[in-house]
């Protein structure tokens, strides 16, 4: 499937900036400002994006053992589209470095959805900036 995870709860065609390991959707002003702040050259392509829940339903798979989310800044917005009462994701790794908001806001959201942060991983060079969450039993 050639598609992306949509930060909105509906399908849409969105511009994606191809930029090696920091490519991202350009769907709002904060994403566009991020591209400018990081001095990233624009190299746009239109991509079809779907909410994660729609993809899981199409695959008839609403239980996920492990989900890694790294979308260069839209992590919390993507998580907010997931109906956690209808999907059983047992463990989630979320990159937090490029997102709008703080890691504390991310933790607060995930705890509110029934998850506990297990570990916050961080390397000073920025290559590892993730939190691992486990669903509470």
Regions found by a protein language model. Give the residues of each.
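Phosphate/nucleotide-binding beta-alpha loop and adjacent structural elements of enzyme active sites
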Residues: 1-137
């Amino acid at each position: 499937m050639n598609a992306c995870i949509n930060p909105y709860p509906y399908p849409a065609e969105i511009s994606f900036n191809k930029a090696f390991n920091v490519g991202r959707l350009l769907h709002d002003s904060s994403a566009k400002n991020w591209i400018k702040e990081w001095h990233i050259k624009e190299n746009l392509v239109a991509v079809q994006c779907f909410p994660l829940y729609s993809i899981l339903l199409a695959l008839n798979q609403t239980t996920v053992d492990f989900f890694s989310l790294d979308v260069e800044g839209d992590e919390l917005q993507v998580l907010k589209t997931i109906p956690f009462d209808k999907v059983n994701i047992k463990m989630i790794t979320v990159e937090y470095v490029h997102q709008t908001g703080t890691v504390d806001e991310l933790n607060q959201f995930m705890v509110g959805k029934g998850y506990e942060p297990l570990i916050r991983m961080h390397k000073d060079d920025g290559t590892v900036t993730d939190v691992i969450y486990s669903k509470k039993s």
